[in-house]
Amino acid sequence: MDNCMSRAEYHWFFEHPVKSHCVMGNDYYFTNETMVCRNGSLTSSGEIFGYYPITHQYFSRYRLPVMHTETNCLGGVDPVGWLRKEWANVHRLKQDGVPLVGFTWYSLQDQVDWNTALRENNGHVDELGLCDLNRNIRPVGHAYKQLIQRWRDLLPTESNVLRI
């Protein structure tokens, strides 16, 4: 067994390619990019390259339709500005011929105890959602709604969008 799969299971996937049914989901957060220090330790670098060049490299390698599957921001980064920046990256990818099939802000509502990966029940709330836990829409939720309203009629008519 390698990675919980038998050799026969590996061979099945090699003999039955499913690439035509795949979408590559790329998450991107402000904390994704990391610098390796001289002593080998890691530190968050913030955004150096950004979603566009990283995702474009993945698309060039794998030639699969792409979905921006997760993004949000915490710790001093303006969520509305971040949303608009990520949307601009997605739109540029589409303009450059990358088949982009979706965009998601994660999560719909604030997250509880994600700072401990749900291992502890502390009731710690990370205010990352489009809405708070009482379903009050945050400014980033209003901005997301505005993006949808502005683009919903245009996106299906663009010649380089949603083509798989």
Model regions and ranges:
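Non-catalytic scaffold segments within catalytic domains of secreted glycoside hydrolases
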Residues: 1-164
